[in-house]
């Protein structure tokens, strides 16, 4: 199976596969990320927004879903209903498999989802839409609309001074460096981009439904 967003950017997807081996990401990792971008932030501020987002996710009506870009299952257990967790990273999916909720996992490509038309009610995508280039976003959105009635996107907010999009250099524990494309969002702008409406507009997190 090809990488979730294709083999044309192996550095990005190899980074996330390798990172999954290092374990789940924490609020501490998020704080380090924002501080690395020059953002003044505290652990409690990020925790408060993350808690609001999780509560919003849990309050959604239960429904069949596909979680695209599930990673190591950061939000999988919060999703109401029943469905599958999909990611390009086998390492990440091993973490999801070992979790207590028992969500089935599928390794696959976000641009070619291995799901029949209108098979589920919801596609949930957390911190993946902001990794897609312009060329990758179009097929992802088309696939999400093909298989589901609703698309819910959770992604990174855009505090003052943070670029809307740029290439980042990420380093893992072993010292290896990767180039990763990243976008940061205003909730209203993201909603307009995917023909949706904002559910949460924070400094560090945004959540939109379409």
Can you say where each PLM-predicted feature lies in the sequence?
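Class I S-adenosylmethionine-dependent transferase superfamily signal
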Residues: 143-144
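Short glycine-dipeptide loop
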Residues: 147-151
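Class I (Rossmann-like) S-adenosyl-L-methionine-dependent methyltransferase catalytic domain
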Residues: 2-65, 71-112, 132, 136-139, ...
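N-proximal accessory regions
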Residues: 119-121
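Short catalytic micro-motifs in class I SAM-dependent methyltransferases
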Residues: 127-131
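Short amphipathic alpha-helix with an adjacent loop that forms part of the alpha/beta core around
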Residues: 113-117
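A conserved beta-strand element that flanks and buttresses the S-adenosyl-L-methionine
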Residues: 124
């Amino acid at each position: 199976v090809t990488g979730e967003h294709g083999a044309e950017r192996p550095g990005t997807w190899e980074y996330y596969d390798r990172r999954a081996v290092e374990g789940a990401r924490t609020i501490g990792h998020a704080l380090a990320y924002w501080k690395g971008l020059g953002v003044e932030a505290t652990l409690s501020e990020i925790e408060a927004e993350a808690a609001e987002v999780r509560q919003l996710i849990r309050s959604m009506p239960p429904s069949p879903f596909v979680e695209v870009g599930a990673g190591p299952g950061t939000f999988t257990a919060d999703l109401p209903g029943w469905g599958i967790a999909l990611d390009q990273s086998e390492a990440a999916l091993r973490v999801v498999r070992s979790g207590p909720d028992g969500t089935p996992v599928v390794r696959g490509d976000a641009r070619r989802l291995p799901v029949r038309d209108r098979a589920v009610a919801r596609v949930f995508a957390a911190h993946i839409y902001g990794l897609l280039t312009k060329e990758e976003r179009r097929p992802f959105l088309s696939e999400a609309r093909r298989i589901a009635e609703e698309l819910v996107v959770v992604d990174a907010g855009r505090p003052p001074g943070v670029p809307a999009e740029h290439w980042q250099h990420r380093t893992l524990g072993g010292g290896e460096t990767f180039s990763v494309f990243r976008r940061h969002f205003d909730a209203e702008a993201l909603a307009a981009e995917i023909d949706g409406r904002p559910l949460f507009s924070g400094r560090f997190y945004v959540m939109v439904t379409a």
